[in-house]
């Protein structure tokens, strides 16, 4: 049984895949398995995976016949994972040579999840640390709360038992894997930080940066997260915390709509408004922080969707006047 199983979901990343796989197979910790799931790539990615599998038995390749999204691909790999601990590496990212060794050193006592040190890697060669307050360990509940607004990141390794009990959320093709990260932190007794580096390649056309109707999936993924919290019997305090974050995210997505609606098709604009209207109608306002709800731009105005939209239009117009819509 390997010490660590790494899930690598692959879709059309042939240009970066060798760097990713080379970084995994050259780890100072040799006792690993690399579970690569090709999500119906149309480039040479699958050929590259087979080449690596032929050279190193630690690489296992699974090919999907149709594109199902990252969460599904990772779940396919997860179903075959046998390591004591399980993590993921995106197929265009890579690890420092000692990253997994440092992760293993941090799994002690009642630590159930270990975060990497994340460095953003830019096309011009610049590197920048993910900004978060330093810590050695925190409780799972503290980590869960910090992850709601990404005060801590989601690049980590977790105990097999937790990951197998809580596979990736496939409710949306984008963003819903964030829910799984939060659930893993929620169920961890302790979450630790290590200095092993995860290099996170910055792509200007990634889902998180792209001007696309898929950005509104973020709100639907949030809704799925709430359903999971309810099914897990989360405390009222946790639900209040998350519902406040959901409300802030709704206003944040309205800002995206305000700034970029002319770059979206009519159909996409209508879809975005429909999703936001649904969240506005169904969010549990009694669980949203009162201090947030009293602020102009954040007042629910549940009596009228049109009035709420007017508030948002005026709010973001005023922000634009003073140069704050960035």
In which residue ranges do the predicted regions lie?
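Conserved nucleotide-sugar donor-binding catalytic segment
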Residues: 140-218
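Glycine-rich, basic loop-to-helix element that forms the pyrophosphate-binding segment
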Residues: 64-81, 88
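Short loop->beta transition adjacent to catalytic acidic/histidine clusters or analogous donor-positioning motifs
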Residues: 2-4, 25-36, 44, 56-60
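Membrane-interface aromatic/basic loop that binds lipid-linked glycans or pyrophosphate carriers
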Residues: 262-326
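Catalytic core of nucleotide-sugar-dependent glycosyltransferases
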Residues: 196-203, 210-237, 248-283
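Flexible acidic/His/Gly-enriched loops in nucleotide-sugar-dependent glycosyltransferase catalytic domains
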Residues: 96-170
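Short, well-formed alpha-helical segments that are part of the catalytic scaffolds
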Residues: 12-26
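A conserved acidic beta->alpha catalytic loop
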Residues: 38-47, 66
């Amino acid at each position: 049984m390997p010490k660590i199983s790494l899930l690598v979901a692959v879709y059309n990343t042939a240009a970066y895949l060798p760097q990713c796989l080379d970084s995994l197979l050259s780890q100072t910790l040799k006792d690993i398995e690399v579970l690569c799931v090709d999500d119906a790539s149309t480039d040479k990615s699958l050929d590259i995976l087979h080449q690596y599998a032929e050279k190193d038995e630690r690489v296992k390749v699974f090919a999907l016949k149709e594109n199902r999204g990252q969460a599904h691909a990772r779940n396919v790999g997860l179903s075959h994972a046998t390591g004591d601990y399980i993590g993921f590496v995106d197929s265009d990212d890579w690890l420092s040579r000692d990253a997994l060794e440092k992760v293993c050193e941090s799994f002690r006592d009642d630590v159930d999840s270990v975060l990497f040190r994340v460095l953003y890697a830019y096309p011009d060669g610049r590197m920048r640390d993910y900004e978060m307050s330093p810590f050695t360990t925190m409780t799972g509940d503290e980590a869960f709360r910090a992850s709601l607004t990404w005060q801590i990141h989601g690049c980590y390794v977790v105990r097999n038992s937790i990951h197998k009990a809580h596979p990736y959320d496939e409710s949306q093709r984008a963003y819903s894997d964030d829910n799984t990260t939060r659930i893993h932190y929620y169920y961890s007794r302790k979450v630790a930080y290590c200095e092993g580096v995860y290099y996170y390649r910055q792509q200007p056309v990634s889902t998180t940066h792209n001007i696309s109707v898929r950005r509104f999936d973020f709100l639907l993924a949030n809704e799925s997260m709430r359903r999971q919290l309810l099914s897990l019997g989360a405390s009222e305090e946790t639900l209040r915390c998350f519902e406040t974050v959901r409300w802030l995210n709704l206003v944040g997505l309205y800002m995206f709509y305000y700034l970029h609606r002319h770059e979206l098709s009519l159909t996409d604009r209508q879809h975005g408004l429909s999703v936001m209207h649904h969240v506005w109608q169904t969010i549990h306002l009694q669980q949203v922080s009162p201090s947030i709800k009293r602020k102009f731009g954040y007042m629910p105005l549940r009596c009228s969707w049109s009035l709420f939209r007017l508030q948002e239009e005026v709010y973001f117009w005023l922000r634009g006047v003073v140069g704050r819509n960035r």
